[in-house]
Amino acid sequence: MKRIMLFLATNLAVVLVLSVVLNIVYATTGMQPGSLSGLLVMAAVFGFGGALISLMMSKGMALRSVGGMVIESPRNETEHWLLETVGRQAQQAGIGMPTVAIYDSADINAFATGAKRDDSLVAVSTGLLHNMTRDEAEAVLAHEVSHIANGDMVTMTLMQGVVNTFVIFLSRFIANIVASNDDEEGQGTNMMVYFGVSMVLELVFGFLASFITMWYSRHREFHADAGAARLVGKEKMIAALERLKMSQESKLDGTMMAFGINGKQSLTELLMSHPPLDKRIAALRNQ
């Protein structure tokens, strides 16, 4: 219940901040909210603003959502190995030392997040540490470090911002046309039509846009696998992916799943954030 309230409060705060920003833009430019340019600006503020704020808050939100414990001073050999391995890989990849955390989950997974290459987070599940060999775990860590080095978090955020902007703009633009052509029974009826149509269209366009974002997410995974292979060798990366084939489906949600080592299954590959493991293994073998 506490997490739900925190989630709702955070989203409300984001909406309020973006509303203030939007009003400042309208006031300083003299732009009319009801104009086409005003609609586009509103779509961009909420489309990009929400994505960028989520990225800036991603480290703290990710740690809270999984109950992650940051390793500051290693208490045992495993934690010491984690810090040493991530530090070495980060140096090889040319990025700053990420914050390293462990979270309690039987799920064999890890994820990376953060707004900057030199201020990021790598989190590893206890399930991964208990069920993978050191070589396999090293490859998974290299995969996450590669995500950071490739700037995938920022690129994915920018893509999501563009997609959000077009979804909001097209939905409101079409809804305005439909509401204007509706029987003129009063302003209230038209506003109800406007909001009803825009909500439905946002759902439809959002679903269609997910094909684009999921395609890019799968594309990123191949690059992160290749980056990991360069850091630790492709045989270790292949062994890690083979191990994942024996594990359960990922329990991570949202952005954390997108930047995890393993994703969720879907009715169609087009809606998967990660390519099938067999395709990832084949791509590594063909390098």
From Swiss-Prot:
| The UniProt record lists the keyword Magnesium | no
* Molecular function terms, GO-annotated: metalloendopeptidase activity; zinc ion binding
Q: Subcellular localization, per the record? A: Cell inner membrane
Q: Which GO terms describe its cellular component?
A: plasma membrane
Which residues are Zn(2+)-binding?
A: H143, H147, E221
Give UniProt keywords alphabetically. Answer: Cell inner membrane, Cell membrane, Hydrolase, Membrane, Metal-binding, Metalloprotease, Protease, Transmembrane, Transmembrane helix, Zinc
Pfam families with a match to the protein in the record = Peptidase_M48
The EC number(s) attached to this protein equal 3.4.24.-
Give TM regions.
4-24, 36-56, 158-178, 192-212
Q: Which Gene3D superfamilies match?
A: Metalloproteases ('zincins'), catalytic domain
Q: Does the keyword Cell inner membrane apply?
A: yes
Family assignment from sequence similarity: Belongs to the peptidase M48B family.
List, alphabetically, the PANTHER family matched: PROTEASE HTPX (PTHR43221:SF1)
Q: What is this protein called?
A: Protease HtpX
Whose protein is this, by species?
A: Vibrio parahaemolyticus serotype O3:K6 (strain RIMD 2210633)
Recite the lineage of the species.
Answer: Bacteria, Pseudomonadati, Pseudomonadota, Gammaproteobacteria, Vibrionales
